[in-house]
Amino acid sequence: MAQLVYSGIPATIRSFRYDEVVSFCEVRKTWGGFSNMSSEYPLLYNGVIYPTAEHLYLAGRFSAHPEIVAMILTHRNAMYCKRLFHGRAWAPLIRPDWAGLQLPWMRYVLNLKYEQHPSFRRLLGQTAGKVILEDSTMLVGTNP
């Protein structure tokens, strides 16, 4: 198996049979609720409602800058927000410890989604133990 490294954490390239996987790409399709972009599951964090998991994830990147978090909250479209706040101009304002926090923060955000939304828990239950994959690549043979 090939080794990849993302944020200092080794990952492996794996192959799955079609019947072993639940994949999602678009929020309006069957498994779209698994996407961080899904507005079906707003999250309450520290008394603030974040429209999507992506909004809360991005807010974590800039937690030392409440003015940026406020800007993130003004954008309803999660994909636009993600693209906007991943630009180079914002890089100096990202938490200096973000590389080590981004995966634990994402786990926390996903746990909030699970805890706060019974319908998300039901969606997860419908996967029947299958591997859940975000179809975020254009590689030939990766689309279900």
Task: Report residues per predicted region.
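Charged, low-complexity intrinsically disordered segments
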Residues: 1-144
